[in-house]
UniProtKB/Swiss-Prot annotation:
It is found in: Cytoplasm. Keywords: Amino-acid biosynthesis, Cytoplasm, One-carbon metabolism, Pyridoxal phosphate, Transferase. PROSITE patterns: SHMT (PS00096). This is Serine hydroxymethyltransferase. The gene is glyA. The record marks 288 as: Plays an important role in substrate specificity.
Amino acid sequence: MASLLDRYLRNISDKSQQNLASVAYLASLDHLLHAFPSIGQSIVQELKSQRSRLKMIASENFSSLSVQLAMGNLLTDKYCEGSPFKRFYSCCENVDAIEWECAETAKELFGAESAFVQPHSGADANLLAIMSIITQKIQSPAVQQLGYKTINDLPEQEYEALKAEMAQHKCLGPSLNSGGHLTHGTVRMNIMSKLMHCLPYEVNLDTELFDYDEIAKIAKEHKPTVLIAGYSSYSRRFNFATLKQIAEDCGAVLWVDMAHFAGLVAGGVFVGEENPMPYADIVTTTTHKTLRGPRGGLVLAKKEYANTLNKACPLMMGGPLPHVIAAKAIALKEAMTINFRKYAHKVVENAQTLAEVFQRNGLRLLTGGTDNHMLIIDLTSLGVPGRIAEDMLTSVGIAVNRNTIPSDASGQWKTSGIRLGTPALTTLGMGSAEMEEVANIIVKVLRNITVRSNAESGSSKSEGELSEGIAQEARQRVADLLGRFPLYPEIDLETLV
């Protein structure tokens, strides 16, 4: 049987029409299918799977083949603990060049004073941010006040006392039900809540918006060392000038987690007081959501934190992933193009089109709409748990995720809402007309779900049903859309057996 690459080259005999990234990608698949068939087939099946669903999970996107190819090389074999030009290993000059270029690109793209590009994930970036703040604002001053040069010089008793004191400092962040992330300190099962005394602020239950006066009131009362702003399920924008003032008034460090909206900052959608960069002391982000890069994280900060961040090893990191850092550099360079700016604006336009159609059809959206890339549908009036809505939409080829809403009585597993996002569909090239179609499909599915309780295991095990006619119609409409906007159109799936 001819290889995937052979068939591709035969089908596109004109060399000027051949895509070099496609050639490289298919060549790697050929090798894996031959040498490690089970792994190769799983990769092929995942490609087919992603091509057969409308990806509407707000935290997911599609990276370029260039980004993917950068991760598949011998850079993965190099240990490089430390920071560029200050490594704990020898022979790191090539990794130094890549990491330095990645950091400089990040600084230019976001207007940051310093950039640390090693974190393996957004959670790692957030952990590094809080550890850097603790080190810079609590630990180092305390060590100096005690008359020592470094924390390693402290006697055991004083060291234990300092650890206990650090854990008493307060951190104020958005609660999970109000749209915050589990790494924002308000989830006790997460390590963040164990590093400081973490307090939540909530959205106003009437407006479902964050109330700056209320945040200021809580901050004034508790005087936190850290004020966190960011979200994983909030469909509006923050005013970072206001949050900076709140932080200054109580002497707090302002840390912004822009994992979800970094691409909207890079693309010039969030500007002025909606851009966190001029106001925040530390900004963290992932690189794989609206930035369309590899899975990973970044920390952007004021210069005063640069030295602490560059000591992430041994603070909380070991060896970085140089092959992923190379891919981050490529994604950041892609984000500097005019095409990316157009993309970022289209992401928000598409989300707002979805919102308009949903509201026109009587669905209730948290906050009444969206100003960013996501929206959350409150399913309470439909009597459909988020878990069941997620399952039923998945069954017709639409990937969303269940999501809690403020004061959610259904809990974290069932939930009363679903979250949807437009980054991935916009990457495929879809626009307002397609969003109208997608929204109408979703409305029809949601309004035709029948919820049935499992008598043996109770209502918590209830299941959803959708008539075959409705389901088949939805699947066909989804297939029609995907047929017009294929993922990686340069890769011919007909050759992937």
